[in-house]
Amino acid sequence: VPPHMHGYYPTSVSYPSIVGEMLASGFSIIGFSWICSPACTELEVVVMDWLAKFLKLPEHFLHATEGPGGGVIQGSASEAVLVAVLAAREQAVCRVRASHPELSESDIRGKLVAYSSDQSNSCIEKAGVLAAMPIKLLPAGEDLILRGAALRSAIEQDVTAGLIPVICIATLGTTGTCAYDDVDSLATVCEQYNVWLHVDAAYAGGAFALDECSELRRGLERVDSLNFNLHKFMLVNFDCSAMWLRDANKVVDSFNVDRIYLKHKYEGQTQIPDFRHWQIPLGRRFRALKVWITFRTLGAEGLRAHVRKHIELAKKFEVFVLADARFELVAPRALGLVCFRAKGENEITAQLLQRLMERKKIYMVKAEHRGQLFLRFAVCGMDPKPSDIEFAWTEIGTQLTALLAEQEHLAAVGKAGDVTELTQQFGLQLTNGTNEKSQ
């Protein structure tokens, strides 16, 4: 990603990852089961446990521990969320059919409902469309955080109406402002109503590895599944999204479609999973190889340093914003994202962005919250530097100065035009009055 691309969350890349991608392409493995490529499956088990320990996730998400939990590499957060939604849906259908045999499957499916925040990513709403299950986007609080109280209120209303709550998708690092939903309070409600809780930590998950960001991990021991994009913070190129499940059997049981040509004598063993049951497609790429090479080359401290660099550079940009009275923050800086706007009407911010896009020196996108238009500045690039931040801020400040000067000039011209018009009208009236007196 170019260092002056600040519109979206970063898409990482590194030379070790590129080498791993090239090797994986050369091997051309379609690792849907252990028997077709033991190395593909076993290396993925290893790196997913490495990553879980690196991010300090609860032990029940590790393959190495006793229990049905484990991790798998999906292509994207969209795939991971869809897998969670589909698995939760099938589990709910089975559970309700067992307790209410008088209901038909179609009756049950027509009553299913899911929940997320109105600040969540579009892929969550799309997962509901693909799963034929409505996802209600609950209003986040003034601080952009979804809490258990809002979820409880929605579930109570739906249960009273005869609906069946299925899953809640919480977000750690929302797309608009990088807000963090209150996972702990959401988990309390989900446990009470037997609702699957999934956490989409596509961006913020990289900060789990930092001791200073330990608060982000609060409540993760209570969730059923979570995902994190390695291609955002971990210097692994797209596509590569890690997903962990507390009980992988719930996904396997929901997606298991066997054929005789797919069976082998080792299937069913917990230490050698057939990952085809953990995902949407049958075939799968050897993504674990680029993760393994990147981790081995850069090391845990190298990856932590990369995340910290993004955070420090965002702090630098935040200082620039706070020091300029013409700008204001819309939300607190979060990790490598700063949300800000030009003070005044939304039109000023919109015109500022238009000028920046026309000049093509930096790239940003706009977002909106509570009727306020704002700009998102995300630190990006394989090796971002302070000079990149300074360049971007200089460009933004210069263009706002030019925009305000242009508006002042137009306003002055408008006032001058009004005065001229009034003078002409007044002069015409004086002339007419003089002529009448002469006559």
Swiss-Prot record:
Concerning InterPro entries, the annotation shows: Aromatic_deC (IPR010977), PyrdxlP-dep_de-COase (IPR002129), PyrdxlP-dep_Trfase (IPR015424), PyrdxlP-dep_Trfase_major (IPR015421), PyrdxlP-dep_Trfase_small (IPR015422), Pyridoxal-P_BS (IPR021115)
Q: Transmembrane stretches, by residue range?
A: none
The terms under GO molecular function for this entry are:
3,4-dihydroxyphenylacetaldehyde synthase activity; aromatic-L-amino-acid decarboxylase activity; pyridoxal phosphate binding; structural constituent of cuticle
Supply the Gene3D superfamilies for this chain. Answer: Aspartate Aminotransferase, domain 1, Type I PLP-dependent aspartate aminotransferase-like (Major domain)
The entry's keywords: Catecholamine metabolism, Cuticle, Lyase, Pyridoxal phosphate
Which is a GO BP term held by this UniProt record?
catecholamine metabolic process
Q: Which residues form the active site?
A: 121
Q: What does this protein do?
A: Involved in cuticle development. Probably responsible for the protein cross-linking during the development of flexible cuticles.
What is the protein's given name? 3,4-dihydroxyphenylacetaldehyde synthase 2
Species for this entry: Drosophila lebanonensis
The gene is amd
